[in-house]
Amino acid sequence: MRAPEFHANAMTSTGCDVCLDPQKSFAKLFKRTVILLAGPTGSGKTDVSLRLAPMIDGEIISVDSMQVYRGMDIGTAKVSWEDRQRIPHYLIDICHVQELFNAVDFYYQAIQACQNILSRNKVPILVGGTGFYFHTFLSGPPQGPSPDCDFRDKLALYIQEHGLSLLYENLCLKDPEYARTITKNDRNKIVRALEIIHLTGKKVSDHKWTKEASECQEYNCRGWFLSPPKELLRDTIHLRCQRMLEDDLIDEVHRLLKQGIRDNSSASRAIGYREWIEFIDQGSPAESYEAVKQKFITNTCHYTKKQRTWFKRYPIFRELPTLGLTAETIAAKIAEDYFLHG
């Protein structure tokens, strides 16, 4: 990712198309602009989006794998009902906690939301930190059978007990041709390959799926990645986790347990929920409260590192350092780029 410049003469990689390829530039005039706003947990994405939307007549699509669930409010830092009344939001509170929701579901619903917003001459703003959902939106839905959460849980336990290298060796025995195309450290692809073999009875290399192109290729996508200093983000996360607990996160977890969150292995493993589910299962011992709180904070910090690493792989997300900038200023910079190049 690279930090952009904000002035009338600035040329981003997208803007340079005007100079390099007139035909491509002409075709792009007919593309509708979609804003992608990403960043690590605690970077201020929500505040920026709420200020950006009125500036460009936009509506917001959540790119958060847990905000789709009703009742998972405090632990996901879900935007308030008042703000959702003021600015339309999509893909929030659309599922019961026992329902499964995956990247394929996200893709089709996000595309539908974009079409809805654009049909009214407004601007879709996709906001969130779930990297794989952004990847799916940009690249098209994953091919193959839907995920099997129970099978994935078994593989996760296997990795915990025996290590990822042994699981990779297992894949090498079952599908050596595919195994040679990935690294022994690529946990996601190893798990997905074994899952496909388990569900279809065929090797991954035997399948001849045709990749479905993403409909977002019809859009002029302009992406941003909010990048606060790491030290400042750690402090923000500490305060954020503390505030969630003061806002009765543990009571929220109790309510979700009664609603059956355990039946959803994805939701029950979400950071901010899995730690306190374990705490409750242990009988909520007072002496372990501080240790669990620290684990909650540490897990969140580790997740932000993964988010930074993930988005660095996608040059469409231009890094926007946020040190010393207010949410209003950041939103104004993104709006300026939209009016210059959108």
UniProtKB/Swiss-Prot annotation:
It comes from Chlamydia abortus (strain DSM 27085 / S26/3). This is tRNA dimethylallyltransferase. HAMAP family: IPP_trans. It comes from the Bacteria. Monomer. Gene3D superfamilies: 1.10.20.140, P-loop containing nucleotide triphosphate hydrolases. Belongs to the IPP transferase family. GO terms for molecular function: ATP binding; tRNA dimethylallyltransferase activity. Keywords: ATP-binding, Magnesium, Nucleotide-binding, Transferase, tRNA processing.
